[in-house]
């Protein structure tokens, strides 16, 4: 397995130092999420500040940007990074798309399928010089003149999609080059639900022979400290309160937990939510281990399930020893 890092930052000024540290330690990739910042701006700084490490968005919101805009962003980043950029796309949930971004909502799986195919159609037009002619569900792209065509660049751009439930997993298998497993997962859910759905998508699209990477971000509780355990419980409670993620809980017979957490969240009783995350739930969703055993336990947990692994906690230069231990264990 490859070892990646999730990069979080308060200001863009921090990005070069963080990604240079990740590259110096031998990590394989850095990923930028779309929470309080635009991940593409951070990816530009990462590309300019490094020479080897791969750079990706995990994830950028697909439904708040047009496919053509996504195509331009990824094309320029692939050129700037000399082929190190990976485009990771996700859906978010309806409330954020409609109420935070003011954009229309549509069924996410068909829309993601159309978005990825449209991005590839734009790239194909730029590569070949042929007229742009994409006709998908609720979308047509038919205008691309030489004036608006960027200079050629030789690098392939892998597209990763993300999701939790089977429909988006199947779409990833149909149209993507890899899949970001949501941090709110268990190995059982990954093995029993996510991977079979991806396989069905790949079989449907007759894409079973090409490469496809499974990217996992894992919750961790290292050395059993209360601070670490409480942080994991808070994050798990937040995700478990989201109705869209209820299927993961249902796979373990914990539907009632999700319903109770949703009620608390709707009433703003955030401080109480983490108390509902029992030790059994914590151990199902998180890697709980002493520091010296952490790398080996992570490797065994995801052996045969993942191709790339990172830990959910934000990357920090103070974690050098932890990441070196992780790299040594996971790559053996």
What label would you give each PLM region?
Residues 1-332:
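Active-site-adjacent structural elements that line small-molecule/cofactor binding pockets in enzymes
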């Amino acid at each position: 397995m490859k070892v990646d890092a999730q990069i979080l930052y308060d200001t863009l000024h921090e990005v070069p130092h963080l990604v240079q540290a990740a590259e110096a330690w031998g990590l394989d990739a850095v990923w930028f999420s779309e929470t309080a910042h635009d991940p593409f701006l951070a990816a530009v700084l990462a590309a300019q500040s490094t020479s080897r490490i791969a750079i990706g968005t995990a994830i950028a919101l697909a439904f708040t940007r047009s496919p053509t805009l996504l195509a331009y962003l990824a094309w320029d980043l692939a050129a700037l990074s000399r082929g190190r950029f990976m485009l990771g796309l996700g859906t978010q949930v309806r409330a954020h798309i409609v109420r935070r971004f003011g954009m229309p909502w549509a069924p996410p799986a068909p829309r993601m399928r159309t978005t990825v195919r449209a991005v590839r159609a734009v790239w194909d037009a730029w590569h070949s010089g042929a007229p742009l002619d994409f006709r998908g569900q609720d979308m047509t792209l038919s205008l691309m003149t030489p004036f608006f065509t960027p200079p050629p660049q030789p690098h392939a751009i892998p597209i990763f999609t993300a999701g939790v439930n089977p429909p988006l997993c199947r779409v990833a298998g149909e149209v993507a080059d890899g899949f970001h497993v949501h941090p709110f997962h268990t190995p059982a859910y990954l093995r029993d639900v996510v991977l079979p759905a991806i396989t069905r998508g790949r079989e449907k699209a007759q894409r079973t022979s090409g490469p496809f990477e499974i990217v996992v971000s894992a919750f961790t509780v290292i050395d059993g400290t209360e601070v670490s355990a409480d942080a994991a419980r808070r994050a798990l409670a937040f995700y478990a309160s989201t109705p869209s993620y209820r299927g993961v809980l249902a796979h373990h017979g914990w539907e009632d937990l999700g319903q109770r957490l949703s009620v608390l969240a709707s009433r703003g009783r955030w401080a109480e939510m983490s108390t509902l995350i029992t030790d059994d739930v914590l151990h199902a969703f998180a890697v709980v281990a002493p520091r010296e055993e952490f790398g080996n336990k992570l490797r065994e947990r995801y052996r045969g399930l993942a191709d790339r692994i990172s830990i959910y906690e934000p990357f920090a230069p103070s974690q050098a020893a932890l990441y070196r231990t992780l790299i040594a264990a996971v790559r053996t």
